[in-house]
Amino acid sequence: MEIKKLYECTVIINGGLEDDAIAATMDEVRNVIAKNGGDIENVLEVGRRTMAYPIGKQTIGSYAHIEFRGEPSGLAAIETAFRYNENILRFLIVHLSTPLLEMRKRVEKYSVVIGSPEDQSEEDQQEESVAAKK
């Protein structure tokens, strides 16, 4: 038995599909990962986005990021299943090594959420406080 490693998979599903079909495709993605020895830790469904360039005449894709632990020997079967799924336009599986995880922690530590008080300039904050007083 191999040691399970941490992976991140980004999937772009055809955005022209109905919401039910996108949800069904996401269920298939989860099932393929689980069937091939993967333990899903985190799923972030970003939703529909306009792509930078068309893929297979599609300009809108539904994006999802999945973090899972799996054996390296199971990746080939996962990739093959994704390639044969017509609803998946693109996918990328990346091994999250220790340096990558450390870099991610540093970025999260210093990142600012858009719309948070840290994101606003002093002028915006002053305008909001003046508006609140009125």
UniProtKB/Swiss-Prot annotation:
GO terms for cellular component: ribonucleoprotein complex; ribosome. GO terms for molecular function: rRNA binding; structural constituent of ribosome. The keyword Ribosomal protein applies. Keywords: Ribonucleoprotein, Ribosomal protein, RNA-binding, rRNA-binding. It comes from the Bacteria. InterPro entries: Ribosomal_bS6, Ribosomal_bS6_sf, Ribosomal_S6_plastid/chlpt, Transl_elong_EF1B/ribsomal_bS6. Pfam families: Ribosomal_S6 (PF01250). GO terms for biological process: translation. Binds together with bS18 to 16S ribosomal RNA. Belongs to the bacterial ribosomal protein bS6 family. This is Small ribosomal subunit protein bS6. It comes from Chlorobium phaeobacteroides (strain BS1). The lineage of its organism: Bacteria, Pseudomonadati, Chlorobiota, Chlorobiia, Chlorobiales. The gene is rpsF.
